[in-house]
Amino acid sequence: MKPSIVLYKSIPTDLHQRLAQHFTVNSFDGLTPDNQPELLAALQQAEGLIGSGGKIDQDFLQLAPNLRAASTISVGYDNFDVEALSQRGIALMHTPTVLTETVADTMMALMLSTARRVVELAERVKAGEWQESIGDDWFGVDVHHKTIGILGMGRIGMALAQRAHFGFSMPVLYTSRRPHEAAEQRFGARHCSLDTLLAEADFLCITLPMTEQTYHMIGREQLAKIKSSAILINAGRGPVVDEQALIAALQDGTIHAAGLDVFEQEPLPVDSPLLTLRNVVAVPHIGSATHETRYNMAACAVDNLINALTGTVKENCVNPQVLITH
């Protein structure tokens, strides 16, 4: 008899069929067991879980007593209580490599569109307001040869540094727990303190995940140290930045502009002051949102779950210590 799994996000047909070759697949639209009796029943039998989003904590895990593996279609896993999963011997799988290049592309797009005011100016053209050459009050700022400061020199940070260094001749500063030899050799990147990065960067680019250590890492005190001409780009996690402090800094000119793909609350509330600011480019968490990358992420998550439930995991496990007991 095939193991039972719960799939709580739509995936391409061929990937669904691949899961069905190995498991009895119970498909649902999201995780709301209180409102879906069928989901509650499926969770009771499920050995595997695959999807994205949802809150997977102690209370949820009590609904799935037979769960052995969870596979998230994402690189981030802050919605999972990793300690609770580990205590129960449940392997948590994620997709850390397949979205790297696409997220770096998104960050470059935010840098360019924010610096050159692409969204504002495109909206003016569409509104029929382009009647003469624009004045200097609508000019943007250069990206090339400006200094980029990267918070977090992981895979995405490296891909962003590559684009900045080779594509735009940008000096690269970065912060990380330890120096990154490859970044320094390939891109001439300079490892520095957060204070130095804040003071020198023209573009402050955040690629960090959400942890207890990174929560509100960039707040009012840090924003006050940034150049008034600097632009903040966040495609890591929203809560890394104190959003209220950022709003104030954008309103009073403490910093020049911001390009944001992530927010403290998602979807972004319709009454958020960020939506009223001309110096903000806000997009709906699209970092990995291309057809190709989303397919590859789903395929990776499918393979991850198959590997976890068949005892063949070689990579992509957040808590590999649980595999020893399997």
From Swiss-Prot:
Principal localisation: cytoplasm
Catalytic site positions: 237, 266, 285 (proton donor)
UniProt record similarity statement: Belongs to the D-isomer specific 2-hydroxyacid dehydrogenase family. GhrB subfamily.
Subunit structure of this chain's protein: Homodimer.
The protein's name: Glyoxylate/hydroxypyruvate reductase B
Organism: Yersinia pseudotuberculosis serotype O:3 (strain YPIII)
Superkingdom of origin organism: Bacteria
A Pfam family assignment: 2-Hacid_dh_C
SUPFAM superfamilies per UniProt: Formate/glycerate dehydrogenase catalytic domain-like, NAD(P)-binding Rossmann-fold domains
Membrane-spanning ranges: none
Keyword NAD: yes
Example of a GO MF term: glyoxylate reductase (NADPH) activity
KW Repeat (keyword) present: no
Protein's job: Catalyzes the NADPH-dependent reduction of glyoxylate and hydroxypyruvate into glycolate and glycerate, respectively.
Subcellular location: Cytoplasm
UniProt keyword list: Cytoplasm, NAD, NADP, Oxidoreductase
Reaction it catalyzes: glycolate + NADP(+) = glyoxylate + NADPH + H(+); (R)-glycerate + NAD(+) = 3-hydroxypyruvate + NADH + H(+); (R)-glycerate + NADP(+) = 3-hydroxypyruvate + NADPH + H(+)
Enzyme class: oxidoreductase
PANTHER family: 2-HYDROXYACID DEHYDROGENASE-RELATED (PTHR10996), GLYOXYLATE_HYDROXYPYRUVATE REDUCTASE B (PTHR10996:SF283)
Its EC number(s): 1.1.1.79, 1.1.1.81
GO cellular component, one term: cytosol
